[in-house]
């Protein structure tokens, strides 16, 4: 992430904006995509990253680099899935029951997706 992504998306994944409009999107945190978005699935995110990132240099990362970046990115908190049922476990079972989803997993002592 530091080598290939931070220049545009920020060291803390906050993205960059100009005049109040996003230029490079936040990859995690309150202004990023929510847990229900396709990029919240590591396989989807890795495929997009491999084909399109870094900007203008799509296809230059190895498969492993794309998966590593996607896993790192999806290991951070983001806005709640709009389909949230009131229970992280139930929401994971219904909408994120995949080894490629970090939703509901514990990372650094915090359950991702917990209110």
Q: Predicted segments — roles?
A:
Residues 1-24, 42:
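Sequence/structural segment immediately N-terminal to covalent heme-attachment motifs in c-type
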């Amino acid at each position: 992430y530091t080598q290939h992504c931070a220049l545009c998306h920020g060291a803390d994944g906050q993205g960059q904006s100009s005049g109040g409009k996003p230029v490079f999107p936040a990859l995690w945190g309150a202004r990023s995509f929510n847990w229900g978005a396709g990029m919240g699935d590591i396989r989807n995110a890795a495929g997009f990253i491999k084909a399109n990132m870094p900007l203008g240099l799509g296809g230059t990362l190895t498969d492993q680099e794309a998966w590593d970046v996607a896993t790192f990115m999806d290991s951070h908190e983001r806005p709640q899935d709009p389909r949230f049922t009131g229970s992280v476990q139930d929401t994971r079972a219904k909408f994120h029951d995949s080894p490629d989803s970090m939703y509901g997993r514990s990372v650094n002592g915090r359950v991702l997706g917990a209110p």
